[in-house]
Amino acid sequence: MGSFNDTSCSYVDVEIKYVDECEERLRRLFDQALLVFLEEEGSIKPLPAVIGDGKNVDLFKLFVLVREREGFDTVSRKRLWEVVAEKLGFDCSLVPSLILIYLKYLNRMEKWAVEESRIVNWDNKDSEKKGCYSGMLHELGNGFKSLLDNGKCQKRNRAVAFGCNHMEESCSEFDRSRKRFRESDDDDKGVGLSSVVIREETVVCAVEEGLSDFSLEKRDDLPGMLKWLALVATSPHDPAIGVIPHSSKWKQYNGNKCWLQVARAKNSLLVQRDNAELRYRYHPFRGHQNIHHPSMYEDDRKSIGRLRYSIRPPNLSKHCSSSCCNGSSLVSLSKSRSTKCRKLTIIASERAGLTAGTSRARKRNKAEIPRRCIKVGHQHQAQVDEWTESGVDSDSKWLGTRIWPPENSEALDQTLGNDLVGKGRPDSCSCELSGFVECTRLHIAEKRMELKRELGDDFFHWRFNQMGEEVCLRWTEEEEKRFKDMIIADPQSFWTNAAKNFPKKKREELVSYYFNVFLINRRRYQNRVTPKSIDSDDEGAFGSVGGSFGRDAVTSSGSDVMICAQNRQCEDY
């Protein structure tokens, strides 16, 4: 345990477990990345590097020490190579050889650390094209994040990499990940930090004024949040819910608001699911490790809910630098130089976590919900009785109400006669003006009456009375002429003015008259007067043949009758 100095940066003793595993994991990633960089240069160099009398050089520690001092150029300019050699356990006489080793082996790694473009940016759509080792660089970049900032921090945190019990406080350490967990509201109350203890499965934060058991207070807020969420679901217009402000004003509220806790919980779940899938997708060595896709541990209900949102690539700038450690718990105490607020950043990743620092929901290390066990066997099956009733071929309740044919179909056949089905109409009739408008209308009326007598009330039930030219019987001659003039005046958008010109007519009546009467008359005119120049039913120029339905279609007979086939054009409006 240690103390936190309010005036200057000081050491804090922290009990950290699994640091050796973190260092070993980081070393393995470093060795893999080094092989990739050496292969890109096209040069073959022996590994491990040997210096002096056959002493092996720890390239990993050499790279960390140089990068900790802001890189190769700064170390050379400030003449710090002797300090680096002393840290590695070498004599000062081996400094030139050590510099040569660094240039040959770690020069490519140095460029990758300096150039931010080489660090995989998951917000970029072209990140998948960075190379097959993008997942390795992703994890290695997070592990070296505190050491690869190119000298932006004056003091570095080396407890992660080398297992020290002293953790230096950095002025900007994990500044990008401070949004994960911070208590900035405590600064206004003057709360001071007293001690930090990290264990394998629990994180206990002891503070002086009113926050002795922080985790218990957060747990007490959970039932209240769930009750508020249930109230919103059952009664969304209840005044007790209150007014939720715009997201831009959420910073003015503390974490005690239920609606703010719900929003944070939703975002945490989305980030957790997204980063788990990205870790599986972009990991280049998943074929050699016992890594399973997270969807294997989820039931069907979760997989259905997964379709409601898309995959959101995580931003490396918002993640912590502890992804190299599986099962480790890391603490970073950071204090702003502006002395405005004191931030406590706690990153606790589970041993079986997929990506450290990506799950806000698991930072309290709550127990996993056990999967539902489905027992299989003859002792766990439902007892279903055998079906003893006979099957029914058809059931009238599924067929609806019978309308046609009627029940007394035999009596109907005797009334109508024995007309052959499919006989068709005769080619000629006994009418005086066979083939003209009056003749055609007469035969249509005969068939309509025949159908009406056969169907009975079903004729009106099927609305046959609202089909054909009978629709115009409910229209006057003046209304028909006005409808025709309206279409001629504006044929493209006459429907917009139809309600104004015919305020007493319903739209259903207007549409029925247009398709059953108006278009039929126009087609009749085109077929009989201009049979050689028919384009479509919506032509601009049209006429009419005969009067309205129910009146004499042709007023003269004999030789004075108009022979339609000899007429080229007619504009009889």
Swiss-Prot record:
Gene3D superfamilies referenced in this protein's UniProt entry, alphabetically: ARID DNA-binding domain
Keywords of the record: DNA-binding, Nucleus, Repressor, Transcription, Transcription regulation
Cited InterPro entries: ARID_dom, ARID_dom_sf, ELM2_dom, SANT/Myb
Matches recorded under SMART domains: ARID, BRIGHT, ELM2
Gene Ontology molecular function, alphabetical: DNA binding
Record's subcellular location: Nucleus
Domain ELM2 stretches: 372-463
Domain ARID: 24-114
Keyword Thylakoid: no
GO CC aspect terms: histone deacetylase complex; vacuole
Keyword Repressor among UniProt keywords: yes
Protein name: AT-rich interactive domain-containing protein 2
